UniProtKB/Swiss-Prot annotation:
One of its GO terms (molecular function) is olfactory receptor activity. The keyword Chaperone does not apply. The gene is OR11H7. Residues 1-24, 79-97, 164-201, 266-271 are extracellular. This is Olfactory receptor 11H7. The lineage of its organism: Eukaryota, Metazoa, Chordata, Craniata, Vertebrata. The chain crosses the membrane at residues 25-45, 58-78, 98-118, 143-163, 202-222, 245-265, 272-292.
Length: 314
């Protein structure tokens, strides 16, 4: 395989969401609003944790790092998606496509491990409250955050490297709104079944391990909370775990359909919808579920926005 073969295709065409212009305008407006809300919600959480010293605890430090991750996760795909609505060519460069591909999967893998760490934090806080301060120290929190980023970006690095080396000498049209693994490898002029198998095997390993751990952690949390001899126990269980599990189920359900047990019979439109759920919908729900429903966080956000108003008036 020589370099001339690899560089034959210099750009790809992302078809995105073809359809009547009016429908595309509506779709563009919805995605833009969701993107703005995602950025605003997650940036507000980061500012609140940064400026309110009462939130300088492992739980909120994890939330701030998770919000930082979500900002980059949506930003690596949504801006290009929005530009493509008004682009006549809808092209993305070869290097741009693989850069997006690399960051999309690396950040997605990082999110899986972040959800694990956050589940572990909730497990310690609720099931072992007396030992929580001595176990979940600032040092351990920093180590766990670093490991999430490290594993997330190294986990698929070998597979992505070999996919990047594939020759692309023929068609360059991707019927998707981002550079996803299966549509991308389908355009290669070389056999891809081994690389595809390795990529999906690694994805399945990460997804299944983290999902089982998260479900196990929340099961133990539910069991502990429900042992409280009052109706408040049920309410606390639902408040603590129910909403978290809704987002986790939505995220993991979508990525499992795509990368653990993909169904060849699914239409392209269905693949786009599933990808849209875990790449755009869940990031906008996370600020609401994990932070904005929290009393301490809402109090801190109130002071942050009040401070911004005072600065603007002055």
């Amino acid at each position: 395989m020589n370099n001339s073969q690899i560089s034959t295709v210099t750009q790809f065409v992302l078809l995105g969401f073809p359809g009547p212009w009016k429908i595309q305008i509506i779709f563009f407006s919805m995605i833009l609003l969701v993107y703005i809300f995602t950025l605003t919600g997650n940036m507000a959480i980061i500012c609140a944790v940064r400026w309110d010293h009462r939130l300088h605890t492992p739980m909120y430090v994890l939330l701030a790092n998770f919000s930082f991750l979500e900002i980059w996760y949506v930003t690596c795909t949504v801006p290009n998606m929005l530009v493509n609505f008004f682009s006549k060519t809808k092209t993305i460069s070869f290097s741009g496509c693989f850069t997006q591909f690399h960051f999309f999967f690396s950040l997605g893998t990082t999110e899986c491990f972040f959800l694990c760490v956050m589940a572990y934090d909730r497990y310690l806080a609720i099931c072992h409250p007396l030992h929580y301060p001595s176990i979940m120290t600032g040092q351990l929190c920093g180590i766990l955050v670093s490991l999430c980023w490290l594993i997330g970006f190294l986990g698929h690095s070998i597979s992505i490297f070999f996919i990047f080396q594939l020759p692309f000498c023929g068609p360059n049209i991707i019927d998707h709104f981002l550079c996803d693994v299966d549509p991308l490898m389908a355009l290669s002029s070389a056999p891809t079944h081994i690389i595809g198998h390795v990529f999906h095997s690694v994805s399945s390993l990460f997804i299944n391990l983290t999902m089982v751990y998260i479900l196990g952690s929340y099961t133990l949390v539910l069991r502990t909370v429900l042992q409280v001899p009052s109706s408040a126990g049920w309410q606390k269980a639902i408040s603590t775990c129910g909403s978290h599990l809704v987002v986790v189920s939505l995220f993991y359900g979508a990525i499992m359909l795509m990368y653990v047990s993909p169904t060849p019979g699914n239409s392209v439109a269905m693949h786009k919808l599933i990808t849209l759920i875990y790449s755009v919908v869940t990031p906008v729900l996370n600020p609401l579920i994990y932070s904005l429903r929290n009393k301490d966080m809402k109090y801190a956000l109130h002071h942050v926005f009040c401070g911004m108003r005072i600065i603007q008036r002055s």
